[in-house]
Structure formats: C-alpha cells, structure tokens
Amino acid sequence: MPTTTVKSTDLDFDNIKASLKNFLKADTQFADYDFDASGLNNILDVLAYNTHVNGLTANFALNEAFLNTAQLRSSVVSHAETLGYEVRSRVASKALVELSVNLSGVTGRPAQIQLNSGTQFTTSVDGVSYTFRTLETFFARDNGSGLYQLQTNEGSSDIPIFEGTEKTKTFLVGETSERQVFVIPDTEIDTKTATVLVFDTASSTNFIQYTPLAEASTIDKDTTVFTIRETPNGFYELNFGDGISFGKKPDAGNKVVVTYLATKGPDANLADTFTATSNITIAGANYSITAVTSAESTGGALRQSIESVRQLAPLAFATQQRMVTSADYKAVIMSNFSAVTDTAVWSGDQNIPVDYGKVYISLNFPTGTAESTKTETQNNIVSNFTDTLGIMSIETEFVDPVDIFLELVVNFDFDPSLTGFTLTSTENSIYNFITTFFNRNLNTFDKIFRRSNLLTEIDALDPAILSSRCETK
C-alpha cells in the first residue's frame, strides 16, 4: 500500500496534480507507469481540476459565511441585517430654496396660498438636466403687500426639494397565512422617500398611512409600521408586521400603494439654479413661482458600498441606538448622513486643552459643499441624534477640519524603448495616478501619507518607468 498522503490544504492546481502523481507512484502496482504519458496525464488533469474546483467552491462558500470575508453584496447585506443594521439605498440629492409668489396688485387675493407636494423644479449639472420636487405641502401668508413667502411647518423659509422621478407600485394582499413578499423592482429607489398607503379594498378611497419602523416609539400588534430591505438581486422588499406582536399586518384584499423617488444619486449634486416647471393656480389664474437658492444640492449618493457596510454594521450594532463612545458617534453619523464623507470624534478629556463635559465632532464634506448645507447637517445631528441618543450632560461642539496640503515633486527615469507611450503621456499618467492615489488613500481623517507606497505604485504603472523619486514640501 502507498505511504504517501495527499495534502488536502494545498489547493493550487499544479500542487494537487503533483501530490496525486506522487501518491500513485508510491503504490507498487503503478511502479512502471509513465504518469506523463497522454492518457494518465489527462486523467490526472481531470482529477486535479475537480479537486481544485471543489476546494475553491468550499473556500468561497465558507468566506461568504462571515461579514469580514464575504465578497458578494447579497452576503454582506444579509450579515448586516442579522446585526440589525439598515443598509442604505440610493439617496436623493437635496437642495434648499426660498419660494415666493407675487400677487401684488391682484384684487381679492387670498390670505393664504398652498404649494402642493410634487411641485417640480428643473436644473442642470454639467449639461445634464435633472428634476427636483417637493415631498410635502407648504403654505404662505400674505405679507400685506401681496408677496407670499412659502414656509415649512417650523417657520423656515428654506424649502427642501429632492431630485428624482416619482414612481408608484401597487400590490394586492392575497389570501394566505404565510408571510407575503412585496418586491419593488427598482434599484434606484431612495427608501427614505417612500410612503406606504394601505387601502381597504382595490377600489376603496379609505386608507391608513404606515410609517417607517425607525420612527415608531412603541410596537404592538396594531402599530402600522413598515420596513424596506434590499433583496439579493438588488431590488427592494416591502415588509409589514406579523399581526401578532410586532406591527399590524395588512388584511387579505387590502391594496398597498408605495410611492417613492427613483434618483440619480450623486450626479445631481452641486446644482445651484432651479426653475419651477409649473405655475401656481389661484382663483383660476396662473402665477409664477420664484425660486432663490439657499443651499445648492448635496447629499445625493449611490447605495451604500460593500466596504462601508462591512465597516459600519458592527459599529452600529455596538451602539445599540445610543451615543456614548466616540465609535458610537461615528457609526450613527456615517450611517445617517450621506453628505458626510468622514467623521472624527473625540471626548473633552482628549482635547487640547482638556474640556470636560463635551464631545467634539469634526465633519469632512465633499469639495464644494455649501456652508449652509454644513450648518444644516450639524443642526440635524444635534436635534435628531445627540440630543435624543446622547448623554444629557454632554455638550456637542463641532470643529472645522484643518486641510493639510502636500506639494510633491516627482522625478522618474524613463526608457522609451520599453513602451509605446511618449514621455509626455507617461507624465500625464503619473500625474493622474497621483491624484487618484490621494483621493483613494488620504482624503479622510487618521490617514498617513507613505511616500514608499506611492513610489511603488508609480514604478508599476509602466515597464518604461525604471525608477522614481519624490520630494514633499
């Protein structure tokens, strides 16, 4: 009998084949066989290939079982859900505008006018047109001279408008005791803009508006809440309660209507001029709506990346909906504010000078973000999160980040005989790569510039680059 064993941990094809060959050679029954002959060689190839594929399949499957090694988006999203983390969908770009209607000189003008939800505004970014719209109804009162300045419920004249196309999906609840799945076949949905209405029947006008689970203060069998989760194929699934202890379940025969925005995400950011596409009708006459931009559009984002989910899901689970440690603050902010690219948080005892009873937050925004947007984000963090989830005696203070700029002088040795590119095109390639390197590795907090890493990647750009040197200032 042979004494040689096959190494089960060696998954490389050539090593598997060599191991099988050595295993068979050790058996006296195959002492005179030529294992490099075409017949036996083909058989060994098949055996090695089969073992190689099976080993890789088992390895891949095991990797997908853990959040930190999973590569498929569906696996990462599934693991995040087990931690109670809501993976962010696309986010519609948001702008603030001051809207007014001038009725001066109009006799019998009303004391109050109304701007309906869904009023559209057009704009363009880099030559591409986008449509923004209101998501709620706003009112304005006559200031005495016929000017109507629209305001929010809080009394602010900054009206939020959001980019996207309004879409509606209708479902009929069937006769079944099993959990029904309501799939929204749209990868561009901004789930935060979704509204869910449940009608008594397909033809009824009576409805109940369900609210997102995150907005519910208490949950019982009669609480009308819904959730929207990402499915393995990239679409989104609408879910309701079980009707027993965790939220109300729609009855058989009910009609479910979901309205939401399908958005282009970051493409519509940095728009600063908006024009109303329609007039407002008052007493049968049409009047134009004047829009003055208070804050350019920002915050639009693609759906959350795999690496972002991998990083934030465990942190969000650790926070347990409270803000105590610096990691809690970072997890909550990064999970809820797509306009923020990075966050640094430290306590008062870590500050210089020491300042007990405070938590310091520094927010990093994309280049070009308006100051009004930064201020609004800070106010939202305080009012919606630190005041409700933080410790009462801890005061929040925001600190502007300090940008550090590096001036690089890069020299390289170039051999034109080793490439088809010219010296000028190679210089441009290196310049573009350096920009990409900084954007990828350094435009966030707690990052270190390592010159050796930069030079190593520059040398690998083209065989004609024999060596490179870098001076920093």
Q: Where are each of the predicted segments found?
A:
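Carbohydrate-recognition loop of C-type lectin domains
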Residues: 4-7, 12-20, 24, 320-441, ...
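Extracellular/luminal ectodomains and secreted, surface-exposed scaffolds of diverse proteins
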Residues: 193-248
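C-terminal structured "cap/appendage" subdomains that terminate the fold
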Residues: 433-473
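Extended assembly-interface regions of large multimeric machines
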Residues: 1-190, 455, 463-473
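Acidic, glycine-rich low-complexity/disordered segments
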Residues: 144-204, 237-238, 246-323, 389-448
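Short, well-structured beta-strand/strand-turn elements
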Residues: 122-134, 206-207, 331-351, 461-473
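Flexible glycine-/small-residue-rich
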Residues: 99-103, 200, 240, 260, ...
